[in-house]
């Protein structure tokens, strides 16, 4: 059975990775990394900045989101029950225009032709952070889930997928580990994990 973790190399170009790192280093908006409960150095040790909300990242964020969208559509095409399963979606048949319930059985015929629009309509991107972990000291050494209630909007409860990019190569350490899948992903510049 699939572990549902896709590792896609070279999604971000070396130039884009370098630009993101340089912009990060110059940003006046760097903050101590936070968990759902705020700053907790026992759980997360990083320096973060929102690249989706800070104007100094606007041009780079647009490029990252274009590339992210392309990969998310491919991911949902591969694991289409992430789209079909959560809600009983009714869509227009691409040939007849008649309303039809989208199912796993008719996904190829009914869902796939309009997949890009369905993904854009049903999923939303939350706040996107760039994070720096210091070798030998940084990290998120706490097994955690990305789903937790947090007032006032409970944004994390809307999360369906996690995606991340690595902006640099790390020779030793720095892996992102997935507990139940017994999988560790090594950082490599341009690599995306969904």
Language-model features: where?
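Fe(II)/2-oxoglutarate oxygenase catalytic core
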Residues: 1-192
């Amino acid at each position: 059975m699939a572990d549902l973790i896709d590792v896609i190399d070279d999604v971000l170009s070396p130039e884009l990775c370098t630009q993101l790192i340089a912009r990060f280093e110059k940003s006046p908006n760097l903050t101590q990394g936070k968990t759902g409960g705020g700053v907790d150095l026992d759980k997360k040790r990083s320096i973060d900045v929102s690249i989706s909300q800070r104007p100094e990242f606007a041009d780079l964020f647009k490029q990252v989101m274009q590339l992210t969208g392309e990969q998310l559509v491919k991911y949902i095409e591969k694991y289409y029950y992430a789209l079909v399963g959560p809600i009983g979606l009714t869509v227009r048949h691409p040939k007849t225009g008649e309303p039809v319930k989208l199912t796993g059985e008719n996904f190829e015929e009914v869902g796939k032709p309009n997949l890009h629009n369905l993904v854009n309509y049903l999923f939303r991107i939350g706040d996107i952070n760039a994070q720096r972990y210091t070798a030998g000291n940084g990290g998120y050494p706490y097994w955690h889930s990305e789903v937790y209630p947090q007032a006032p909007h409970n944004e994390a409860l809307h999360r369906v997928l996690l995606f991340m990019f690595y902006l640099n190569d790390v020779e030793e350490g720095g892996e992102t580990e997935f507990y139940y899948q017994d999988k560790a992903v090594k950082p490599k510049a341009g690599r995306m994990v969904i």
